[in-house]
């Protein structure tokens, strides 16, 4: 991931009085102001919401209001630093920024985290909470509470964060503020009187946000005199500095030249530079307890794998006196795809490009793969379908590489008769029914708990869709007279099969979806394969539930037939599950009349020409299958 701390797109509106920011604060003056602020006047907070509710826009307004950035055409979505984030209008990577705000004559040091809204990037949100004491719970006045609003609330509540409810987009004609306030009270037990009404687009109501943050969110707790206790919250790779760490200090101070040790790996480092994001990387002489900033080492940390998120750092020699911070749960890939270069001669260059992206996205798993049809490639694991799509876009934009991606699949688990377990990520490696040990084995597939919100009028259609996708209803709740929250347990395989797109179609775009892993369930799984003239095509293979075999098999052969040209010999396309052929399509050959010029009585010549044509078709068929 390229985190070169570059600015975002433009914003030309300024409908409120923000402090002048034309002249950038000199580094020495900035450090002096920060040094004069005690930890009691620190506030660390994040903005959480459903996707497209206005988190990044509100972040821009707060940065402008505090004078951290100027209200110019160059500063829209300034915390969205990836091209794909600006193009899609979504936040993929949680970004941080430090602000200084004068409230009632006193300076406050505010640390803001802009978090992703999409469920695929929930791990980014969870890590952000570790560096915060509170959160702005943002809700779109036109949409109301949606699936990821509910999920983010429960995550924040579990972390015991102080919540400040904020209603955004109040300037929109479709805004229904009383409905949103009622939803907040009924679903989250948040007092409507505490909600802040604003429009992040125009700036209306934005000046009320920071006083509420200062008054309602507690300051961090820490002691500068204690030994260093530093939590690793995030990391990224820089070509010149090596691995750069985003850290939160609980105790002590850290400065350039300090010798630190990782309690997780035992490796020792010398600090090369410390600083804050203001909003870009701004070096400082020291980071103190309660602050969030960046650190890199000299010589630099070379491997991103050495930066274990949730790790604790302290001074060399103080290891026995510091209790490690609770670590983070590493996100597990839920979607796997095989990736191949469009031209095998580009394999080495594409490998370098993929490795560079994986350096900065630790949630992507990578291992080499090979296909008889497509050649050498990789098997990539992603957190979800959007994560996969974003990775492909970044590969194209940042490295100019195109790649062939197979259909997304989910892993399956096998418990063999002897009790040993095996997780199969590549469907081609899933054992067939002819495998000697498969009869006594137990097969499992991953399930997710899906939370769906929608208007009441679409409830019947959504239930029908979930049941058709092998879902089991867990709860049904009306959190408003016209809004429903529906909870289903659904196989992860059905989720990646464009369930969200089907939900949008069934509800005319009004449904929202959030999900979380709910573990493995025993299931009747079979391997569905595509054969062309009895030869398996390994790139087209999937592990599916037995109830889906016939439908998918017919879809495969029908679709594959459309992409195969007619030949001089018969092409037979079959979908098989175990020993059973579930669907078949035949492409008839071109026919050349080799007997047209023969006399009717020339039987031997007739037989000879027919045999020659038959042999020729065999050679063509063999040549076709070897391509």
Swiss-Prot record:
Catalytic activity from the UniProt record: GTP + H2O = GDP + phosphate + H(+)
Keyword Membrane belongs to the record: yes
CDD domains per record: EF4_II (cd03699), LepA (cd01890), lepA_C (cd03709)
EC number(s) given by UniProt: 3.6.5.-
NCBIfam families: lepA (TIGR01393), small_GTP (TIGR00231)
Originating gene: GUF1
Name of the protein in question: Translation factor GUF1, mitochondrial
Assigned protein family: Belongs to the TRAFAC class translation factor GTPase superfamily. Classic translation factor GTPase family. LepA subfamily.
Transit peptide segment: 1-16
GO biological-process terms attached to the record: positive regulation of translation; translation
Compartment list: Mitochondrion inner membrane
GO molecular function annotation: GTP binding; GTPase activity; mitochondrial ribosome binding
Membrane topology of this protein: Peripheral membrane protein
Organism: Fusarium vanettenii (strain ATCC MYA-4622 / CBS 123669 / FGSC 9596 / NRRL 45880 / 77-13-4)
Presence of the UniProt keyword Nucleotidyltransferase in the record: no
Chain residues that bind GTP: 49-56, 114-118, 168-171
Keywords linked to the UniProt accession: GTP-binding, Hydrolase, Membrane, Mitochondrion, Mitochondrion inner membrane, Nucleotide-binding, Protein biosynthesis, Transit peptide
Cross-referenced InterPro entries: EF-4 (IPR006297), EFG_III/V (IPR035647), EFG_V-like (IPR000640), EFTu-like_2 (IPR004161), G_TR_CS (IPR031157), LepA_C_sf (IPR038363), LepA_CTD (IPR013842), LepA_IV (IPR035654)
Cellular component terms (Gene Ontology): mitochondrial inner membrane; mitochondrial matrix
Residues covered by the tr-type G domain: 40-221
Protein purpose: Promotes mitochondrial protein synthesis. May act as a fidelity factor of the translation reaction, by catalyzing a one-codon backward translocation of tRNAs on improperly translocated ribosomes. Binds to mitochondrial ribosomes in a GTP-dependent manner.
